[in-house]
């Protein structure tokens, strides 16, 4: 019994020391985004807890709006919408032109929940554009999508859980257009044989995993062979996350 107590005490002490070392490291590095209790700032590069902080914006529309405005993201607030018992949104926005974003979404009539919009802005600045410059020497000018809001259950589960699309907390990304009109498609280029296109798509998928609760790609199943599903599921700041 004494040996067990000594082992338990030693383990807890070691964990406390590791936690203290981590806090010191993050503080000295000047990266508050790597700490779970610091405030989210969209001007900061993504950190270890950025994705969880974005998910924590679900059901906190005023805080999400304040962050978007401070970051220079222009948008229009959509009227609250209710579509039956399980569908609708109270934090819907539509991106507006200008401001700190430079990417157009096609089609332009994209209704998304505010936490999804915040995640997309960070994705553009810190993942998509750097990857495009690295692989093609050009910026992305537009991102094509299959939409966000859709009052439905998860595909393939007729009687199962409701999709995050039912509350505009998800978006399906299908392609990227570069400044020279080059089009990079998830369906055609995920395994299309062009190393640069394949590497770009995998890089933006993996980067999205740091910013969204669930990210599904062609690696997940056939239903996602032509798009990336990216959502901000309402699991809070410490809930389960998934990336495929």
Describe these PLM feature segments.
Residues 1-5:
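N-terminal Lys/Arg-rich, disordered targeting/topogenic segments
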Residues 134-168:
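Active-site-adjacent substructure of cysteine-protease-like catalytic cores
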Residues 9, 13-14, 162, 169-244:
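Catalytic cores and adjacent binding grooves of peptidoglycan-active enzymes
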Residues 52-60, 112-120, 124, 162-168, ...:
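Extracytoplasmic/periplasmic, Sec-exported soluble proteins
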Residues 53-143:
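Active-site acidic/histidine clusters and adjacent loop/turn architecture
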Residues 35-56:
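Short extracytoplasmic/periplasmic juxtamembrane "stem" segments immediately C-terminal to an N-terminal membrane anchor
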Residues 9-27:
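Hydrophobic membrane-insertion alpha-helices, especially the h-region
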């Amino acid at each position: 019994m004494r040996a067990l107590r000594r082992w338990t005490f030693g383990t807890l002490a070691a964990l406390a020391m590791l936690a203290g070392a981590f806090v010191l490291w993050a503080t000295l590095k000047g990266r508050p985004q790597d700490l779970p209790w610091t405030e989210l700032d969209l001007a900061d590069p993504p950190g270890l807890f950025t994705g969880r902080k974005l998910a924590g914006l679900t059901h906190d529309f005023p805080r999400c709006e304040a962050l978007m405005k401070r970051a220079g993201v222009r948008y229009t607030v959509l009227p609250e919408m209710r579509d039956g018992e399980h569908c609708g949104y109270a934090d819907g926005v539509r991106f507006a032109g200008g401001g700190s974003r430079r990417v157009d979404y096609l089609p332009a009539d994209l209704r998304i929940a505010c936490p999804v919009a915040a995640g997309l802005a960070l994705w553009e600045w810190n993942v998509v554009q750097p990857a495009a410059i690295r692989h093609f020497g050009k910026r992305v000018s537009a991102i094509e999508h299959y939409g966000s809001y859709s009052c439905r259950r998860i595909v393939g589960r007729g009687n199962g859980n409701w999709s995050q699309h039912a509350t505009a907390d998800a978006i399906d990304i299908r392609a990227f257009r570069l400044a020279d009109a080059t089009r990079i498609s998830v369906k055609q280029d995920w395994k299309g044989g062009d190393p640069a296109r394949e590497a770009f798509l995998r890089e933006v998928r993996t980067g999205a995993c740091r910013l969204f609760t669930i990210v599904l790609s062609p690696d997940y199943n056939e239903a996602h062979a032509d798009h990336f599903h990216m959502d901000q599921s309402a699991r809070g700041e410490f809930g389960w996350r998934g990336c495929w």
